[in-house]
Design a protein with these regions (language model features):
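Metallo-beta-lactamase
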Residues: 42, 49-51, 145, 152-225, ...
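Accessory terminal helices/loops
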Residues: 2, 201-203, 214-275
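Short acidic-hydrophobic surface loop/beta-edge motif
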Residues: 12, 36, 136-142
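Short catalytic-loop micro-motif centered on adjacent basic/acidic residues
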Residues: 43-46, 69-72, 147-148
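Divalent metal-coordination and catalytic microenvironments
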Residues: 36, 46, 61, 75, ...
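Active-site HxH/HxHxD metal-binding segment of metal-dependent hydrolases
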Residues: 55, 59-138
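Basic/polar N-terminal segments that are highly enriched at the extreme N-terminus
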Residues: 1-17, 273-275
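Conserved beta-strand hairpin/beta-sheet module of binuclear metal-dependent hydrolase folds
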Residues: 9-59, 63, 160-174
Length: 275
Protein backbone atom coordinates (compact mmCIF):
# COMPACT_ATOMS: atom_id res chain seq x y z
CA UNK A 1 0.00 0.00 0.00
CA UNK A 2 1.41 3.34 -0.97
CA UNK A 3 1.06 6.88 0.27
CA UNK A 4 -1.29 7.38 -2.69
CA UNK A 5 -3.83 5.41 -0.63
CA UNK A 6 -4.22 2.54 -3.08
CA UNK A 7 -5.54 -0.95 -2.61
CA UNK A 8 -2.62 -3.33 -2.07
CA UNK A 9 -2.08 -7.01 -2.82
CA UNK A 10 0.75 -8.71 -0.98
CA UNK A 11 1.82 -12.31 -1.73
CA UNK A 12 4.04 -14.52 0.42
CA UNK A 13 5.13 -17.97 -0.75
CA UNK A 14 5.83 -20.58 1.93
CA UNK A 15 7.34 -23.32 -0.23
CA UNK A 16 4.16 -23.94 -2.15
CA UNK A 17 1.57 -22.49 0.23
CA UNK A 18 0.86 -18.96 -0.90
CA UNK A 19 -0.80 -16.33 1.24
CA UNK A 20 -2.38 -13.43 -0.60
CA UNK A 21 -3.38 -10.34 1.41
CA UNK A 22 -5.81 -7.86 -0.15
CA UNK A 23 -5.65 -4.60 1.77
CA UNK A 24 -8.11 -1.73 1.32
CA UNK A 25 -7.03 1.91 1.01
CA UNK A 26 -6.28 3.81 4.21
CA UNK A 27 -9.51 5.80 3.84
CA UNK A 28 -11.33 2.49 4.33
CA UNK A 29 -9.26 1.60 7.38
CA UNK A 30 -6.84 -0.61 5.43
CA UNK A 31 -9.20 -3.57 5.87
CA UNK A 32 -7.16 -6.74 5.33
CA UNK A 33 -8.65 -9.89 3.84
CA UNK A 34 -6.59 -12.94 3.00
CA UNK A 35 -6.39 -16.01 0.79
CA UNK A 36 -4.57 -19.18 1.79
CA UNK A 37 -3.73 -20.89 -1.50
CA UNK A 38 -2.73 -24.54 -1.37
CA UNK A 39 -2.20 -26.98 -4.23
CA UNK A 40 -5.85 -27.48 -5.11
CA UNK A 41 -8.01 -25.06 -3.14
CA UNK A 42 -8.40 -21.61 -1.62
CA UNK A 43 -9.43 -20.62 1.88
CA UNK A 44 -10.68 -17.06 2.37
CA UNK A 45 -10.43 -15.00 5.55
CA UNK A 46 -12.98 -12.18 5.91
CA UNK A 47 -14.72 -10.20 3.22
CA UNK A 48 -14.03 -6.42 3.19
CA UNK A 49 -16.51 -3.70 4.17
CA UNK A 50 -17.86 -1.87 1.13
CA UNK A 51 -19.25 -3.83 -1.79
CA UNK A 52 -16.89 -2.43 -4.47
CA UNK A 53 -13.86 -3.60 -2.49
CA UNK A 54 -15.50 -6.94 -1.69
CA UNK A 55 -16.20 -7.51 -5.38
CA UNK A 56 -12.66 -6.50 -6.29
CA UNK A 57 -11.38 -9.00 -3.74
CA UNK A 58 -13.64 -11.70 -5.19
CA UNK A 59 -12.37 -10.87 -8.65
CA UNK A 60 -8.82 -11.39 -7.49
CA UNK A 61 -9.79 -14.66 -5.79
CA UNK A 62 -11.42 -15.92 -8.98
CA UNK A 63 -8.33 -14.97 -11.00
CA UNK A 64 -6.41 -17.68 -9.15
CA UNK A 65 -8.56 -20.30 -10.91
CA UNK A 66 -8.96 -22.63 -7.95
CA UNK A 67 -12.12 -23.60 -6.08
CA UNK A 68 -12.91 -21.95 -2.75
CA UNK A 69 -13.10 -24.45 0.09
CA UNK A 70 -14.66 -22.00 2.55
CA UNK A 71 -14.75 -18.47 3.93
CA UNK A 72 -13.73 -17.86 7.54
CA UNK A 73 -15.27 -14.83 9.25
CA UNK A 74 -13.06 -13.75 12.12
CA UNK A 75 -15.47 -11.71 14.24
CA UNK A 76 -18.68 -9.75 14.41
CA UNK A 77 -17.65 -6.32 13.14
CA UNK A 78 -19.30 -5.35 9.85
CA UNK A 79 -16.07 -4.36 8.11
CA UNK A 80 -15.23 -8.07 8.16
CA UNK A 81 -18.57 -9.72 7.36
CA UNK A 82 -20.45 -7.30 5.07
CA UNK A 83 -18.31 -8.44 2.15
CA UNK A 84 -19.27 -12.06 2.74
CA UNK A 85 -22.84 -11.18 1.75
CA UNK A 86 -21.73 -8.88 -1.06
CA UNK A 87 -19.24 -11.11 -2.81
CA UNK A 88 -19.09 -14.62 -1.35
CA UNK A 89 -22.74 -15.53 -0.77
CA UNK A 90 -22.27 -18.62 -2.93
CA UNK A 91 -19.58 -19.99 -0.61
CA UNK A 92 -19.68 -21.85 2.69
CA UNK A 93 -18.99 -19.63 5.69
CA UNK A 94 -17.39 -20.71 8.96
CA UNK A 95 -16.78 -19.07 12.32
CA UNK A 96 -17.12 -19.64 16.03
CA UNK A 97 -20.68 -20.18 17.20
CA UNK A 98 -20.47 -17.04 19.34
CA UNK A 99 -19.39 -14.96 16.34
CA UNK A 100 -22.24 -16.31 14.24
CA UNK A 101 -24.69 -15.33 16.98
CA UNK A 102 -23.32 -11.78 17.12
CA UNK A 103 -23.65 -11.39 13.35
CA UNK A 104 -27.21 -12.75 13.42
CA UNK A 105 -28.22 -10.50 16.32
CA UNK A 106 -26.46 -7.27 15.42
CA UNK A 107 -25.95 -7.51 11.67
CA UNK A 108 -29.38 -6.18 10.59
CA UNK A 109 -28.96 -3.17 12.86
CA UNK A 110 -25.51 -2.53 11.40
CA UNK A 111 -27.07 -2.45 7.93
CA UNK A 112 -29.70 0.01 9.15
CA UNK A 113 -27.09 2.21 10.81
CA UNK A 114 -24.72 2.30 7.82
CA UNK A 115 -27.20 2.57 4.93
CA UNK A 116 -27.71 6.36 5.24
CA UNK A 117 -23.96 6.87 4.80
CA UNK A 118 -23.01 4.12 2.37
CA UNK A 119 -26.22 3.32 0.47
CA UNK A 120 -25.61 0.71 -2.22
CA UNK A 121 -21.95 0.44 -1.21
CA UNK A 122 -22.98 -2.04 1.50
CA UNK A 123 -25.27 -5.08 1.22
CA UNK A 124 -28.99 -4.92 1.92
CA UNK A 125 -28.80 -7.83 4.33
CA UNK A 126 -26.18 -9.77 6.23
CA UNK A 127 -25.21 -13.35 5.63
CA UNK A 128 -24.46 -15.39 8.74
CA UNK A 129 -21.88 -18.17 8.33
CA UNK A 130 -23.72 -21.48 8.13
CA UNK A 131 -21.02 -23.57 9.80
CA UNK A 132 -19.10 -23.47 13.05
CA UNK A 133 -15.61 -24.31 14.16
CA UNK A 134 -14.75 -25.12 17.76
CA UNK A 135 -11.93 -23.55 19.69
CA UNK A 136 -9.23 -26.02 20.61
CA UNK A 137 -9.73 -28.13 17.51
CA UNK A 138 -7.81 -28.43 14.27
CA UNK A 139 -8.59 -29.43 10.72
CA UNK A 140 -6.53 -30.33 7.68
CA UNK A 141 -7.68 -28.53 4.54
CA UNK A 142 -5.98 -29.54 1.29
CA UNK A 143 -3.00 -30.86 3.24
CA UNK A 144 -2.51 -27.82 5.50
CA UNK A 145 -3.30 -27.89 9.22
CA UNK A 146 -5.51 -25.13 10.66
CA UNK A 147 -5.68 -24.73 14.45
CA UNK A 148 -8.65 -22.81 15.84
CA UNK A 149 -8.73 -20.66 18.96
CA UNK A 150 -11.20 -18.26 20.54
CA UNK A 151 -10.06 -14.91 21.92
CA UNK A 152 -12.49 -13.09 24.19
CA UNK A 153 -12.55 -9.54 25.51
CA UNK A 154 -9.77 -7.99 23.44
CA UNK A 155 -10.50 -5.79 20.40
CA UNK A 156 -14.02 -7.19 20.35
CA UNK A 157 -16.20 -9.57 22.34
CA UNK A 158 -15.02 -12.79 20.72
CA UNK A 159 -12.81 -13.59 17.77
CA UNK A 160 -11.60 -16.59 15.83
CA UNK A 161 -7.81 -16.85 15.78
CA UNK A 162 -6.25 -19.37 13.39
CA UNK A 163 -2.74 -20.78 13.47
CA UNK A 164 -1.02 -22.47 10.56
CA UNK A 165 1.76 -24.31 12.42
CA UNK A 166 3.45 -25.89 9.41
CA UNK A 167 4.28 -22.49 7.94
CA UNK A 168 4.49 -20.40 11.13
CA UNK A 169 1.54 -18.11 10.39
CA UNK A 170 -0.95 -16.57 12.81
CA UNK A 171 -4.19 -15.28 11.31
CA UNK A 172 -4.74 -12.65 14.01
CA UNK A 173 -7.11 -10.32 12.17
CA UNK A 174 -8.27 -7.51 14.49
CA UNK A 175 -6.02 -8.49 17.34
CA UNK A 176 -3.27 -6.82 15.31
CA UNK A 177 -3.34 -3.52 13.40
CA UNK A 178 -0.34 -3.12 11.12
CA UNK A 179 0.81 0.45 10.52
CA UNK A 180 -2.60 1.98 11.19
CA UNK A 181 -4.40 3.30 14.25
CA UNK A 182 -6.16 0.72 16.40
CA UNK A 183 -9.93 0.57 16.91
CA UNK A 184 -10.32 1.01 20.68
CA UNK A 185 -14.09 1.10 21.04
CA UNK A 186 -14.39 -1.50 23.80
CA UNK A 187 -11.62 -0.08 25.97
CA UNK A 188 -10.40 -3.52 27.02
CA UNK A 189 -6.76 -2.46 27.01
CA UNK A 190 -5.37 -4.91 29.56
CA UNK A 191 -6.79 -8.13 28.18
CA UNK A 192 -5.99 -7.13 24.63
CA UNK A 193 -2.36 -6.58 25.64
CA UNK A 194 -2.31 -10.01 27.31
CA UNK A 195 -3.58 -11.66 24.14
CA UNK A 196 -1.00 -9.84 22.04
CA UNK A 197 1.73 -10.94 24.41
CA UNK A 198 0.64 -14.54 23.86
CA UNK A 199 1.14 -14.07 20.13
CA UNK A 200 4.49 -12.42 20.69
CA UNK A 201 5.60 -15.35 22.85
CA UNK A 202 4.66 -18.03 20.32
CA UNK A 203 7.65 -20.01 19.15
CA UNK A 204 7.94 -20.79 15.49
CA UNK A 205 5.45 -18.16 14.35
CA UNK A 206 6.59 -14.87 12.88
CA UNK A 207 4.24 -14.04 10.02
CA UNK A 208 1.12 -12.28 11.23
CA UNK A 209 -1.99 -11.60 9.20
CA UNK A 210 -3.66 -8.50 10.65
CA UNK A 211 -7.23 -7.33 10.24
CA UNK A 212 -6.03 -3.91 9.11
CA UNK A 213 -2.82 -3.11 7.27
CA UNK A 214 -0.13 -5.19 5.62
CA UNK A 215 1.11 -8.56 6.91
CA UNK A 216 3.74 -8.09 9.57
CA UNK A 217 6.15 -9.79 11.94
CA UNK A 218 6.18 -9.86 15.73
CA UNK A 219 7.80 -6.43 15.97
CA UNK A 220 4.45 -4.94 14.99
CA UNK A 221 2.71 -7.03 17.66
CA UNK A 222 5.01 -5.41 20.22
CA UNK A 223 4.23 -2.01 18.68
CA UNK A 224 0.53 -2.72 19.20
CA UNK A 225 1.14 -3.51 22.86
CA UNK A 226 2.97 -0.22 23.31
CA UNK A 227 0.20 1.64 21.50
CA UNK A 228 -2.38 0.13 23.85
CA UNK A 229 -0.28 1.04 26.88
CA UNK A 230 -0.11 4.64 25.67
CA UNK A 231 -3.83 4.76 24.87
CA UNK A 232 -4.70 3.35 28.29
CA UNK A 233 -2.58 5.95 30.06
CA UNK A 234 -4.15 8.80 28.07
CA UNK A 235 -7.66 7.44 28.62
CA UNK A 236 -7.07 7.33 32.38
CA UNK A 237 -6.55 11.10 32.40
CA UNK A 238 -10.27 11.63 32.01
CA UNK A 239 -9.91 13.82 28.93
CA UNK A 240 -12.63 14.62 26.45
CA UNK A 241 -12.86 12.44 23.37
CA UNK A 242 -11.29 15.16 21.24
CA UNK A 243 -8.38 15.71 23.62
CA UNK A 244 -7.83 11.95 23.86
CA UNK A 245 -7.60 11.85 20.07
CA UNK A 246 -5.16 14.77 19.97
CA UNK A 247 -2.81 13.19 22.51
CA UNK A 248 -2.81 9.76 20.88
CA UNK A 249 -2.25 11.29 17.45
CA UNK A 250 0.65 13.29 18.84
CA UNK A 251 2.15 10.09 20.25
CA UNK A 252 1.70 8.20 16.95
CA UNK A 253 1.83 10.73 14.11
CA UNK A 254 3.01 8.24 11.51
CA UNK A 255 0.25 5.65 11.83
CA UNK A 256 -2.27 5.75 9.00
CA UNK A 257 -6.10 5.68 8.90
CA UNK A 258 -6.73 8.59 11.25
CA UNK A 259 -10.42 8.14 10.44
CA UNK A 260 -10.32 5.14 12.81
CA UNK A 261 -10.86 7.57 15.70
CA UNK A 262 -14.18 8.68 14.25
CA UNK A 263 -15.28 5.05 14.14
CA UNK A 264 -14.66 4.29 17.80
CA UNK A 265 -14.63 7.40 19.98
CA UNK A 266 -18.40 7.28 20.42
CA UNK A 267 -18.10 3.73 21.77
CA UNK A 268 -15.08 4.34 23.98
CA UNK A 269 -16.61 7.43 25.55
CA UNK A 270 -20.02 5.88 26.14
CA UNK A 271 -21.98 7.78 23.51
CA UNK A 272 -22.91 4.64 21.55
CA UNK A 273 -23.71 1.00 22.26
CA UNK A 274 -21.35 -1.95 22.27
CA UNK A 275 -21.26 -2.59 18.49
Amino acid sequence: MTKENATSIHIKDFQGVKIHSFVAPYEYAANATHIIETANELVIVDGQFITPLALAFRGYVDSLNKPINRVFISHGHPDHYFGYASAFADQKGYSLEAVNKIIAEWGPQMITNQKPTFGDMIPDQVLVPQHTVKAGTSEKIDGLNYEFESVEGAENEVQLLIKLPEIGVVIAQDLVYSGVHLWLGMGWFDNWMKELQKISDLEGYNYILPGHGLPCVKDEVVNNIRYLMTAKAIHRKGLSAEDFKKELLAAYPHRESVMMFDLYLGFLFGQMGSH
